[in-house]
C-alpha cells in the first residue's frame, strides 16, 4: 500500500478518536471504550456517567 495513503488513514483515525473523546467530555457522556467496559460489568443495569462506571442506573426510586 502507498505510504502516503497509510499515513492519511492513520491521521484520519486519530482525528476521529480525538473528536469522539472531546465531544464526550463536552456533553458529559462517556467515550465508547468506557461504555463497553461498563456494559461488561456484572451488575443489574450498568451504565457510564461522568467518565465512571455505575451500577443500577436504570432503577427508579
UniProtKB/Swiss-Prot annotation:
Residues 1-24 form the signal peptide. Expressed by the venom gland. Disulfide bonds: none annotated. Keywords: Disulfide bond, Secreted, Signal, Toxin. It comes from the Eukaryota. One of its GO terms (molecular function) is toxin activity. It is found in: Secreted. One of its GO terms (cellular component) is extracellular region. Contains 4 disulfide bonds. Belongs to the scoloptoxin-14 family. This is U-scoloptoxin(14)-Sm1a. It comes from Scolopendra morsitans (Tanzanian blue ringleg centipede).
Amino acid at each position: 500500500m502507498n505510504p502516503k495513503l497509510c499515513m492519511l488513514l492513520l491521521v484520519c483515525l486519530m482525528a476521529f478518536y480525538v473528536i469522539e473523546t472531546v465531544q464526550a467530555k463536552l456533553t458529559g457522556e462517556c467515550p465508547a471504550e468506557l461504555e463497553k467496559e461498563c456494559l461488561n460489568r456484572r451488575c443489574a443495569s450498568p451504565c457510564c456517567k461522568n467518565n465512571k462506571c455505575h451500577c443500577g442506573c436504570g432503577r427508579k426510586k
